[in-house]
Amino acid sequence: QLQLIVARQEFDSRRPIPRIKLPSFALVGQMRDPEVMTAELRRLAISMIGFFNVVCAMEGQPQMDIDIEKLGQAQLVSATFLPDPNQQPSQVKIQYNFSPTVVFHDQLLIVSSTRTLAEQLLAGSEKLGPPTEANTALRVDLPALERILADNRQQLIVQNILEEGSTQEE
């Protein structure tokens, strides 16, 4: 069973806040053989972050700092983009929406676009009951979806004005 979770992202004022704000998202699933898979997937996550750092460095993009830690019985591998001291607050790149994180806890595996969402899902996993028998289920929180879209309303209007020559009212 795999779950896809998408949530509005709250940004920490101590970190760069991107101009375009994306929702955070995560895949949550169960590992069949956690003793073997945890080590394999942890190495894979670290290797992927390292690979992205090499690519980012070659393209002059910000790089990520890797953090590996235990949170209770869970293991977290996370990465955050290093702040660029020369970047204007209004020009923070879209990459700063992401702090990729992988969580391993018993059989639980969380692959998240942000550390905050990963920690929330880990905390919430302890409150979950047994898995359901549903093949496909969808739950949408419409007010939350509206807030996600509102986060980028002004940016979308400006982009439309520049590309289409529209007025702000259009």
Protein language model regions, located:
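Signature of soluble extracytoplasmic/periplasmic domains of secreted precursors
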Residues: 1-170
